Amino acid sequence: MRRREALRQAQRWVIKVGSALITDDGRGLAHEQMSAWADQVAALRKAGRQVTLVSSGAVAEGMQRLGWRSRPRALYQLQAAAGVGQSGLVHAWSDGLARHRLQTAQVLLTHDDLSDRRRYLNARSALREMLRLGVVPVVNENDTVVTDEIRFGDNDTLAALVANLVEAEALVVLTDQPGLMDRDPREHPDAVLLDEVRAGDPELERLCGSPAGVLGRGGMLTKVRGAERAARSGTYTVVASGREGRVIQRLADAEPGLGTLFVPDQEPLAARKQWLASHLQTRGALSLDEGAARALRESGKSLLPVGVVAVEGGFSRGEMVVCRDPAGIEVARGLVNYAAEEARLICGRASRDIETTLGYVDEPELIHRDNMVVTV
């Protein structure tokens, strides 16, 4: 089966629509364009596919309603604009899809919702039930309550995490660019569109020369990283131009040469591992010797204190930490069994020495393999 045929077979879709495609050049939402997008989403639903929308545009709509001509930089001003614009954004999607007798649901998420196991499972169950009922969820970051430390950062990342959450087979990221080019098209007019790439190819990041737009936070780099993240649940990602006519239907028909297809190049992670991988913020880092790093990379074994040479940061038991090899490269991340001060006391020691060092022993491992995801 040609790899684009995976799109024809995909039953569960996440579609991310960028700000440039649904705003009137910064003057609020472009309702005619949104209505046209709703028509395409409705056609996909009519074909029996489940669809989740991740939609930008709340800040741009809020700026219009507040009379602001330039995007603010202060977080509290962005939050105010998002709060004002969010209702208009969801209302516009609701109106467009209601013409096709489709129900929508507003879903606002924060990183904390996905890093807490119970809330993560609740969000997953709610979204899956909406999809089962034929509802089109419209997902966005809950900008009015997040801080810089706990924000997703951009809707490309959020879309990938939602794809993981609902175990989508296809993620479509619609932008104002044709896809990923082999060179920066601003500097090389003869740059060629890449038709198909491996989602985890480390060479892709160097091709991302385009910055984010004025109204959006994401550039091509966030889309490449989002595709890699989505691939953890086996999701195929397409980055394509929303300026193309009937682009969603054409992608669903597996049309070749439309956008860039990011192909998953590893086995999908188990559900719990996907949750672990969804943590964007970490509380500290463990520096490993070569033997421990190799054991994690090649065998996915638990991390024992003896393989740790240094502890960075201040973290509590059960928080997420990064594991780095001697070159400083992340090899894994996981939920640690000991607080930072305890970890500093037992690092480099055999597990049998934990009790004599601390006066007690909680676990023989610093991080158990079930609470760890290898990231290389």
Curated annotation (Swiss-Prot):
Residue positions binding ATP: 16, 175-176
Cellular compartment(s): Cytoplasm
GO MF term list: ATP binding; glutamate 5-kinase activity; RNA binding
EC number, as in UniProt: 2.7.2.11
An individual GO BP term: L-proline biosynthetic process
PROSITE patterns according to UniProt: PUA
SMART domains: PUA (SM00359)
Binding-site residues, substrate: 56, 143, 155
Catalytic activities: L-glutamate + ATP = L-glutamyl 5-phosphate + ADP
Pathway(s) the chain acts in: Amino-acid biosynthesis; L-proline biosynthesis; L-glutamate 5-semialdehyde from L-glutamate: step 1/2
Any single GO CC term annotated in Swiss-Prot or TrEMBL for this entry: cytosol
Chief subcellular location: cytoplasm
Domain of life: Bacteria
PANTHER family recorded: GLUTAMATE 5-KINASE, ISOPENTENYL PHOSPHATE KINASE
Protein role: Catalyzes the transfer of a phosphate group to glutamate to form L-glutamate 5-phosphate.
Similarity annotation: Belongs to the glutamate 5-kinase family.
Xref: HAMAP family: ProB (MF_00456)
This protein's name: Glutamate 5-kinase
Organismal lineage: Bacteria, Pseudomonadati, Pseudomonadota, Gammaproteobacteria, Chromatiales
